[in-house]
Amino acid sequence: MELGKTKSVHIVGVGGAGMSAIAELLLKSGFRVTGSDLSSGEVTEKLAEHGAIIYKGHRAEQVAGSDVVVYSSAIRAEDNIELIAAEKAGIPVIKRDEMLGELMRYTYGICIAGTHGKTTTTAMIATMLIESDESPTVMIGGISDYLKGSTVVGEGKYMVIEADEYDRAFLKLTPTIAVVNSLESEHMDTYGTLDELKEAFVAFANKVPFYGRVICCVDWPEIRKIMPKMNRLCTTFGIDEPADVMAFDIVLDNQHTTFSIKAFGQEYRDVSLQVPGRHNVLNALAAFSTGLELGILPERLIAGLGRYSGMRRRFQVKYDNGHGLMVVDDYAHHPTEVKATVRAAKSGWRDSRIVAVFQPHLFSRTREFAHEYGWALSHADMVYVADIYPAREKGVDYPGVDGELIADAVRKAGGKHVEFVADMQNLFTALKEWSVNGNMLLFMGAGDITHLATRVANFCREGVAVQGNEDSQSGFAAS
């Protein structure tokens, strides 16, 4: 892969999921990569192992010698000292999505978009193509167990990209196949209204060339509404609504899911996934539909889906003692994702008490969706709400908005056992008492709640967890 005379790329915010994937792809393609981030961890350490030079913190001198500087939408360009220094030095400064568009230019692009499920669907498609010997290039905004990372540099013609709608980033991509996996209100700080978000998805779909294909999930009402505006060939998929590709005979059993597919009049049985939940059946249908469009034999697609083994922080089991005590970590941060994750836990582990531990992400999202979070979490047997992870926002701009807003919404939705615990140490102390057989401790959120999940899993792994019994902690059975 070549980008003219560009040889050295500096990435601001390199530890982020989407940015680290670009860094990894550039490294594997022979570029010199430097990057900076306010914090270090597993992701930045892995990049360093691949040859990247990683700086902790932002300093002007770190962009010296770079041919281009790349940054994500999460970075405020006017406030970042490295971006300011690059512009003063005449070094081109571009956003992540523009770099992605350049990397895709001469490939057969498969772009997966949607307010939910795009990371998993992208990884499923990647797994299927690799298992079908297509050797794709892949960029995912998360770590795939199968890929052992977020990026693959393949020799084949396909480039599989997770397409992010935040800041309209996906409109810079050039898909030949565009998957629209889901659509509802999200990222209102970018779009302002749901109608504006819908128009962006229409524009994304219409970037497909006349010989390409748009693949749409018709179980989502907002997708059905915008399909008439998509001036391209479409394949539809779903479970509840009539579609070209549909799933039936769905069986959810712990970590495994089985179902059958009817596609364009043909039936395919014994489809098996190593991940739980109806939402993952929809993700698999999106992947299967994509594979059919590429002309891959259905039998190979089904075998590839069976090899998909999950994503880091997508219902990731961090501890399981085999006697009913589990610690699960999930990235769910939108009410619909929280609902799907709790539902997967309740339907797959019917004999377990589900102890949901939720960290809200963003003050604006908490304020906008408090009622919906309450309803989604109320289906768990016990709910702990942590304080809000602010990310790019400041609490002073949102007076009166904290985790108690969601805890109160859970109570109003019928949740009988819910607590707001702002301090992480106090929350850890409370969760130790729940580390008994028969309980699934289900951590959800896009912030640093994952560190608490790891800490609780380590506590359980050290053998401190006690045997559950009729009188243990909760005093009630799983509902």
Curated annotation (Swiss-Prot):
Q: What does this protein do?
A: Cell wall formation.
Source organism superkingdom: Bacteria
Give start-end of the signal peptide: none
The compartments listed are: Cytoplasm
Organism whose genome encodes this protein: Pelodictyon phaeoclathratiforme (strain DSM 5477 / BU-1)
Q: What is this protein called?
A: UDP-N-acetylmuramate--L-alanine ligase
Query: What family does the Swiss-Prot or TrEMBL record give for this protein?
Result: Belongs to the MurCDEF family.
Q: Name one Pfam family in it.
A: Mur_ligase
Query: Membrane spanning segments where?
Result: none
PANTHER family given in the database record: UDP-N-ACETYLMURAMATE--L-ALANINE LIGASE, UDP-N-ACETYLMURAMATE--L-ALANINE LIGASE-RELATED
Query: Where is the major localization of this protein?
Result: cytoplasm
* Single GO BP term: regulation of cell shape
GO function terms (MF aspect):
ATP binding; UDP-N-acetylmuramate-L-alanine ligase activity
